């Protein structure tokens, strides 16, 4: 297996590619951060469900959500990367697709959506946009 320099970008790319190909499920390696991001994406209604499988080498299987023939996810974009970190203050948290999408932020209070971060009045690192 190849060494992945940005596992979060790899996860988002796998989800994006699976939605383009109309796959029902997609799998990738487990990490706690990925699970937290998937919990946020699931609460926002972009995926049906996800499961952690395996004992020693854990994998995550995500069940994608479709409305008819269209995916619930129109787009995914990794913002802050290992080579270029992107931070924002609470007052400058961006609206994704004029409020129709979500931004996932890593804050001092954990991983939050853009709306949760505004309510908590905390800024942080912008992980990804999903719309």
Swiss-Prot record:
Keywords from the named record: Ribonucleoprotein, Ribosomal protein, RNA-binding, rRNA-binding
The keyword rRNA-binding is annotated on this UniProt entry: yes
Record organism: Mesomycoplasma hyopneumoniae (strain 7448) (Mycoplasma hyopneumoniae)
Matching HAMAP family: Ribosomal_uS8_B
Tagged with keyword Acyltransferase: no
Entry's family note: Belongs to the universal ribosomal protein uS8 family.
A single MF term (Gene Ontology): rRNA binding
GO biological process: translation
Name of this chain's protein: Small ribosomal subunit protein uS8
Alphabetized InterPro entries for the sequence: Ribosomal_uS8, Ribosomal_uS8_CS, Ribosomal_uS8_sf
Function (record text): One of the primary rRNA binding proteins, it binds directly to 16S rRNA central domain where it helps coordinate assembly of the platform of the 30S subunit.
Pfam families found in the cross-reference section: Ribosomal_S8
CC per GO annotation: ribonucleoprotein complex; ribosome
Complex formation: Part of the 30S ribosomal subunit. Contacts proteins S5 and S12.
């Amino acid at each position: 297996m190849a060494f992945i320099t940005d596992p979060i970008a790899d996860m988002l790319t796998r989800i994006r590619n699976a939605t383009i190909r109309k796959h029902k499920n997609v799998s990738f390696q487990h990490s706690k951060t990925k699970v937290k991001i998937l919990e946020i994406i699931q609460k926002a209604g972009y995926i049906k469900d996800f499961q952690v499988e395996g004992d020693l080498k854990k994998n995550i299987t995500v069940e994608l959500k479709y409305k008819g023939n269209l995916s619930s996810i129109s787009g995914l974009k990794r913002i802050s990367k290992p080579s270029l970190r992107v931070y924002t203050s609470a007052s400058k948290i961006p609206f994704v697709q004029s409020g129709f999408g979500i931004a996932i932020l890593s804050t001092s209070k954990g991983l939050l959506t853009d709306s949760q971060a505004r309510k908590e009045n905390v800024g942080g690192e912008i992980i990804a946009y999903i719309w």
